[in-house]
């Protein structure tokens, strides 16, 4: 079962086990958090996580190769690893102690049907460094975090809940439009405020920003955001060229 009223949520039934998965991206960090809850179970249950890694541009696919750095380091409740030079470390952590089993392996021939429909390359190989195992009890929640910086694992639950509270629930047509507009807010630095031109190809483009700005702020009762973006464009960019296109 799938729902997305507040955040994407999927309910799974496997035999006598029922568990849910919710996920959110951090608004201001390069981080995804996934929340697993064991809704029902009739016996001892262990969750096993296999992270599939690509370390590539969104515009490209990757293939199995011998250049991968297969090393990793243990961090609080998880590990960090980096497949290739020049990329940031990837921190994978949980809100409770887990066991990591090192088992490097390539999963070949993963397919993306939508890309195939569009006539683009649609098959790639993904690297899996191993797997995490963690026991879970009925009613218990486990939160997984993946990001380019370490996180205080004791705060993961609070961080997740804060992200959920900041979301606009899709309970009306207006709220759906408001939610969509908010997804384009972009803050590369703490004092910055922009609008992205589109996902995944575009970044900040002045013409698109000015066209979309009133509808993405004033029309959803957010004049503060409008003023902050205008101030950022007019006064904080170092040159007229930077104010026009980035």
Residue spans for each PLM region:
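Acidic/polar, glycine-enriched structural segments that form the non-catalytic walls/loops
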Residues: 26-31, 41-204
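Alpha-helical support elements that line or immediately flank enzyme active sites
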Residues: 202-233
